[in-house]
Amino acid sequence: MKHFEANFDGLVGPTHNYAGLSFGNVASFSNASAVSDPKSAAKQGLKKAKALADMGMVQGMLAPQERPDLHTLRRIGFSGTDAEILNKAAKEAPALLRACCSASSMWTANAATVSPSADTQDGKLHFTPANLVDKLHRSIEPVTTGNILAATFNNSRHFSHHQHLPEHSSFGDEGAANHTRLCENYGNAGVELFVYGQEATNPNAPKPQKYPARQTLEASQAIARLHGLSEENTVYLSQNPDVIDQGVFHNDVIAVGNQNVLFYHQQAFLDTQNKFDEIQQKFGDSKVHFIEVPTAKVSIEDAVKSYLFNTQIITLPSGEMAIIAPTNCQENPAVFAYLNELVTLGTPIKQVNYFDVKQSMQNGGGPACLRLRVAMNDMELAAVNQNTLMNDALFTRLNAWVDKHYRDRLSVDDLADPQLIIESRTALDELTQIMKLGSVYQFQK
């Protein structure tokens, strides 16, 4: 049986805009009110996904959320026709309207935490949608995320889907952006690393002072319990609160792992050496390559600006590892110099490939944000909804779908345009037919 890691990228939705909703995310905040280009954003994401499929990787797509989210606006007291609701919200509560129009579900690293069957007690692949309670615009995603995941991984013999954690800050959960898995081979039991920013039940534990810690230890422990993980293959690491206060809002902005490699910044974690000793002990006899990037070579500021660590490390069919990096890494002299050096250091990482995902980057999400990793075997892949898997036909069809339905210019003021609801719902209704998802959206029920 073959084992591999698949990547499921989020399709950028028709309302992709720059509303600056994410406090603690420097790129999101600094580009607030810029005019976005949803068509280009979607095409950039598709191009990256297709390039990985062309490299021989298993690549899938996850559908976006329904936006504008009129159901949430109704729930908080706006009434009337769809157009009237948009108009009232734009006048009376523009910040709430912006939150209900976000295309942030494109960053599927926050969609869920995934544990492969090799790690779980019942031998199934487990999915728990992230509750994303720290940010209003993302906290309205989990139910639809669960619907989309269940329609994509739609076989109960192989896949187990859990409800998101209770919607309270004690269980703040940001999904796979704070989780990585190390393993010798994808089919072997691995070591799952859960990175948290604070302990909700321990007021004396370290926590950031300026920006919120979005992931709690309690949430990470709950996910491990739900997924049936053993203590022997689970490690909890505290993120350095100082780097959270410098704009490192998720662990995938400061570290990334793949198989036997953990690529991280010198300042990423607390109690680093003890935790790495625990990882190595639980990993077993084979060596884990801990690749540390020193502050002297790349500052936290440069790491956040370029998204050096929000890259994907993938294992190519040849067995070599490659980094999938945003072009912003090429444009930052310190980061570009480091990546050129990295491939000469004798680590498993042998090449770097650069992709333009600037529409996503300007809203605070690099290549790693755009994908949910699912380690699986060929039997499990055969059980996935095949209409969600990237190939020449799907790439052509989705590009044509984007051309047909997406605007090439969207300002924050445009979010109050009633036509946007019609355009978005028409697009998503057609998408559910292309990807054979069934009725995953509220407007379809």
Curated annotation (Swiss-Prot):
Assigned EC number: 3.5.3.23
Keywords: Arginine metabolism, Hydrolase
Gene Ontology MF terms: N-succinylarginine dihydrolase activity
Pathway listed: Amino-acid degradation; L-arginine degradation via AST pathway; L-glutamate and succinate from L-arginine: step 2/5
Keyword Hydrolase: yes
Record: residues binding substrate: 19-28, 110, 137-138, 214, 252, 363
Catalytic reactions of this protein: N(2)-succinyl-L-arginine + 2 H2O + 2 H(+) = N(2)-succinyl-L-ornithine + 2 NH4(+) + CO2
Keyword Cell membrane belongs to the record: no
Enzyme class of the recorded protein, top EC level: hydrolase
Active site: E174, H250, C369 (nucleophile)
GO BP terms, alphabetized: arginine catabolic process to glutamate; arginine catabolic process to succinate
NCBIfam families from the UniProt entry: arg_catab_astB (TIGR03241), PRK13281.1 (NF009789)
Family the UniProt entry places it in: Belongs to the succinylarginine dihydrolase family.
Listed HAMAP family: AstB
Role: Catalyzes the hydrolysis of N(2)-succinylarginine into N(2)-succinylornithine, ammonia and CO(2).
Assembly mode: Homodimer.
Stated name of the protein: N-succinylarginine dihydrolase
